[in-house]
Design a protein with these regions (language model features):
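Short, intrinsically disordered, charge-balanced linker/junction segments flanking boundaries
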Residues: 187-195
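Acidic, glycine-rich flexible loop segments
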Residues: 1-177, 191
Length: 195
């Protein structure tokens, strides 16, 4: 008999999920969207003897890279940096014209995190005293991260805040790609001894 299930969940900044009031103070939630989808499937290959199971899950999350805007920005906003919009545009244009470097946006952009993983497992009841399990796990993920806040000489600060703004392409991507395979034998050697 094959058994399985499919699932999907979603969260975003909709008022269904996120409030707009904190102890009497109105708050505006940043835009985000998260989708989780997956399925599982399991079945005996040989009744009461050999079984197989698998599952898959993927997660996609988009969230603001920054909620700050520059002074003079057409976007406006509640968190305004003292850095001028015109200066950021001029710097981006200079970097492209002089070096061919695309800085990316400096406000109003999103970061994306994506993850995909699956597992395959088999269980073999060899006999009353021995059970063998084999499993394989595969996980791939990418997460866009804003520029590091590590301070340089002179106590510089590179992250977007009141005194500074950074471009999206100043950030980096963390990749977490993992593969794992396990073969496990559980044996009952005697009533008091197991491996």
């Amino acid at each position: 008999q094959i058994e399985g299930s499919v699932y999907q969940t979603q969260r975003n900044n909709s008022s269904r999920y996120v409030g707009d009031n904190a102890r009497g103070v109105a708050v505006t939630a940043s835009k985000f969207d998260e989708k989780v989808q997956g399925f599982r499937l399991g079945s005996p290959i040989i009744k009461n003897k050999l079984f197989i199971f698998g599952n898959y899950e993927q997660i996609e999350r988009t969230e603001p890279g920054t909620t700050w805007t520059s002074t003079g920005s057409p976007l406006g906003g509640a968190q305004v940096s003292r850095v001028k919009y015109s200066d950021m545009v001029a710097l981006s244009t200079f970097m492209k014209d002089k070096f061919g470097y695309e800085t990316g946006p400096f406000e109003g952009y999103s970061n994306t995190n994506a993850s995909k993983k699956f597992l395959i497992r088999t269980d073999w009841n060899i006999n009353d005293k021995n059970k063998l399990t084999a499993r394989y796990v595969n996980h791939n993920s990418n997460a866009e991260i804003n520029i590091s806040n590590s301070q340089s000489a002179g106590n510089g600060n590179r992250t977007t805040q009141f005194n500074a703004m950074s471009f999206k392409n100043s950030g980096y991507i963390i990749q977490d790609n993992t593969r794992s395979a396990v073969l496990e034998l559980n044996s009952k050697i005697s009533n008091t001894l197991h491996n």
